[in-house]
């Protein structure tokens, strides 16, 4: 009879909550592809030199994946599900004089055959934070904390099989997705944790 929680506060962000809602509702069909380029974690050598523990296996236990990206890794599996296979190139000290990874490109495969990539680095300037989820009936794009839906009038699979022209494309409507605007972060997670204990 124990209650356990982890502080994955980005799950309270209104944009990511809306992405989770839209994907898990099934209204947009199954996921076909996932792409997250999250390279806006730029760090200088001075940052890494500021403490002997930084960017070491003993002091931090890892690099960009563990230090900068744990919330992104949580979000990609929360929203898209757990991949069944992961292959990755993790480059240790590629751009900085450090012993842990500062550049990662991961390839993901999901149980339904969907594929994806997760790309991160602490050496891209300017960096990018763009999260795309392509589904059977559209695409979600999250960039600069704005969520856009590219919604197809008909499922891509159905259109592919019934379209008469070889270069036809399914009609698509693009709109910014409204959210509730709430972003409770740590307070929201702590409130939920306390509520679970008390009730």
Roles of regions detected by a PLM:
Residues 99-103:
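A short, glycine/Asx- and small/polar-enriched loop/turn
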Residues 70, 95, 119-127:
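Glycine-rich phosphate/pyrophosphate-binding beta-alpha loops
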Residues 4-7, 117-119:
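Short catalytic-loop micro-motif centered on adjacent basic/acidic residues
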Residues 2, 10-97:
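Predominantly a Rossmann-like dinucleotide-binding segment in NAD(P)-dependent oxidoreductases
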Residues 110, 132-199:
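C-terminal glycine/acidic-rich active-site capping loop/insertion
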Residues 2-3, 112-114:
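Short, well-ordered coil/turn segments that N-cap beta-strands
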Residues 31-34, 117-120, 142-144:
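Beta-strand scaffold of nucleotide-dependent catalytic cores
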